[in-house]
Amino acid sequence: MTDTLNPLVAAQEKVRIACEKLGCDPAVYELLKEPQRVIEISIPVKMDDGTVKVFKGWRSAHSSAVGPSKGGVRFHPNVNMDEVKALSLWMTFKGGALGLPYGGGKGGICVDPAELSERELEQLSRGWVRGLYKYLGDRIDIPAPDVNTNGQIMSWFVDEYVKLNGERMDIGTFTGKPVAFGGSEGRNEATGFGVAVVVRESAKRFGIKMEDAKIAVQGFGNVGTFTVKNIERQGGKVCAIAEWDRNEGNYALYNENGIDFKELLAYKEANKTLIGFPGAERITDEEFWTKEYDIIVPAALENVITGERAKTINAKLVCEAANGPTTPEGDKVLTERGINLTPDILTNSGGVLVSYYEWVQNQYGYYWTEAEVEEKQEADMMKAIKGVFAVADEYNVTLREAVYMYAIKSIDVAMKLRGWY
């Protein structure tokens, strides 16, 4: 395995190993190694200067074994079909670990949204829905926000879908909507809240006291921000935060006594950057990755913990809040060095869990308070965490292997009952 392994091949290998360790019928791997449906579309957009550009878009529906497909849509210049297929596979197992009635889905458009005007972005978003309309629906495939997409884009998605659907207000076809338009309280904070719960429980499992732990978080976007906030709420102390600046590149902040979340957030809102924050010293990105911590939480980019970087990480536990932050080679090195790891499929699953709550609330037209959402989320995540930990102990496997195995158990039963093998 190398750091450049195709993401789909890497995901398939994890599924193969999990099926093998469980002693599954060979048909289980055959049914799960490839998506059931992948659609590629071309989306023409009339630009503000009068020219027409055509953008490539995709939607992958990995499995319908237990229910409709569910997963985000990303707008990014590096999106491609293999990435979308791999991410849809991961979503099947993320939902399976949580016991959700979903298979995995993922979509994308190859575009840098920063280069588009708001009008162009809206036309592109609506074009994606038009191209995929007959494959979407609250009982077919349910998209949500992902990289560079948000509640506004989900609102355009819904509006276009309703126009195509004979004005039926099937707003549950998309989640991650603003609260004013059928969204759920707690959705914006859901992933970071869930990460903090997983960090807390993983710390207990590996004998780390949260109140004494030195914790580092890479990234202060949506996931990183709410991870830091909720780790602090759980009694933890974040002493290092790494971030990126358009002008100055990668950098980090460090305070061994802990960085105050409220002060940091107020500084960022006032200055649009963390650079110059008086409550911590600025350090380099390289220093961030080599300092001594109890727990490190990559919450930004994929493939940041490479084989080389894994050799210098000085922590007892890695909790993957980002999607795919550890390369296969990095994973191998961490395991060899005895550094424990809680995988992304479990750690960052809070987002899809609260998306599920949004979908449920849309069906009933009855909406919960933020406190009710948090209570339900913690209970459901605790069930998944305990289940994954139990599988790891029963089979003497890593937590990454265990989360796939735990998910496969329920998916396997559904496929067998449906007569798929």
From Swiss-Prot:
Keywords: NAD, Oxidoreductase. Substrate binds at K70, K94, S355. GO terms for molecular function: glutamate dehydrogenase (NAD+) activity. The active site is at K106 (proton donor). Its EC number is 1.4.1.2. SUPFAM superfamilies: Aminoacid dehydrogenase-like, N-terminal domain, NAD(P)-binding Rossmann-fold domains. The keyword Oxidoreductase applies. The record marks D146 as: Important for catalysis. This is NAD-specific glutamate dehydrogenase. The lineage of its organism: Bacteria, Bacillati, Bacillota, Tissierellia, Tissierellales.
